[in-house]
Amino acid sequence: MSDPAQVLRDFAPTKEFFVGIDSDGCVFDSMEIKHQECFAPMFIKHYALQATSKYAREVWTFVNLYSKTRGCNRFHAVIHALDLLRTHKEVQARGVKVPSFPALLDWVERESKLGNATLDAEVASGNEALVP
């Protein structure tokens, strides 16, 4: 399988500057469909929010597409969405227990490079609270 990043590593500059455009959600209107059809359903499934799926989808979409937090790191988005969902009156009325993850919040607050590699390293270092 070819390495898609190899094109950039092999790139030979012909000018003293480079203009790059992140097309995901900027050039192409692809963010809504990704969040509504993929990320929101996985958020609901992963955190067992089926009993409140309508509101979980609403909150996820708001956090990631329509609020001041649009474009935030995915770990921040999960925390924001769960926190907001926990305060939603319809969710509270249904008695749905929305999970909280203090270990994730702690890690997000102290880690400067939020990504899968640093999360894996944190788990490997013994932070069992982050193990799914």
PLM region descriptions:
Residues 14, 26-132:
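Alpha-helical substrate-recognition element adjacent to the catalytic core
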